[in-house]
Regions:
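Short beta-strand elements
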Residues: 73-94, 201-212
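Asparagine-centered strand-capping/turn motif at beta-strand->loop junctions
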Residues: 1-7, 130-136
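Short, solvent-exposed loop/turn segments enriched in Ser/Thr/Gly
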Residues: 122-128
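Low-complexity, acidic Ser/Thr/Pro/Gly-rich terminal tails and inter-domain linkers that flank the onset
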Residues: 89-121
Length: 212
């Protein structure tokens, strides 16, 4: 990241990353860059078997940029694209469910399937899923509670998916002391709200059970 200003420091916040229009869940970016300075940042993805960054022909980054010394500002939005195979190449990812996916839910708000359950290099269990927003609303989805084999675990995650848009997301269970082979049941909740009407309460608040 490069701050071309001579006298202002800016905060760069990654609002979203999309691969061919599909929202991808990442570690996020929130970095302050001083005037005239550059900063290298790392964006972390969870490895999964459904896709890699090489699967997409168009990676779209949406940043909100704030003056670090100003208050109560909305921030300017900057959008840029990376075309791994060239801008005019006809490469576009399409999600094609295989026999290993497990249906999660199909209601008037969204359709979702579990694509994979596995532990990462830190020993945390992850439930990967694909979700399609069936509404004309921008949805804010969060998960803040869950369990592993009935033992309570935090699953704090936040997702934002636009009207008719799809999302690759994952739920993480941290600080596990249970070997992966002994995990029989994973539970988590999804609370779904209309971004433009958060005061109106949830459109859906439901607990799901997944067997790895």
């Amino acid at each position: 990241m490069q701050n071309k200003s001579e006298d202002k420091s800016y905060v760069f916040v990654l609002k979203s990353l999309e691969g061919d229009g599909i929202v991808l869940t990442t570690s996020g970016i929130s970095e302050t860059v001083e005037p005239g300075q550059e900063k290298q940042v790392n964006l972390i993805f969870q490895n999964n078997s459904t896709y890699s960054l090489k699967s997409f022909g168009d990676l779209t980054f949406r940043f909100a940029i704030f003056d670090s010394n100003a208050k109560n500002q909305k921030g300017e939005t900057d959008v840029f694209h990376i075309y791994p195979y060239g801008e005019n190449k006809e490469v576009s990812y399409v999600f094609a469910p295989n026999d290993s996916v497990k249906p999660l839910d199909d209601n008037e708000i969204f359709e979702a399937v579990v694509t994979e359950c596995k532990q990462d290099q830190f020993g945390d269990e992850n439930v990967f899923f694909y979700l399609r927003n069936k509404t004309n609303k921008r949805l804010y989805i969060n998960s803040d509670k869950g369990s592993v084999n009935g033992e309570t675990r935090s699953t704090t995650r936040y997702f934002d998916v636009g009207p008719g848009q799809s999302l690759f997301g994952f739920i993480t269970y941290q600080d596990l002391t249970i070997p992966e082979a002994e995990i029989k049941e994973l539970q988590f909740n999804l609370r779904v709200q209309d971004v433009d009407n958060l005061a109106g309460g949830p459109l859906l608040d439901k607990t799901y059970t997944v067997t790895p």
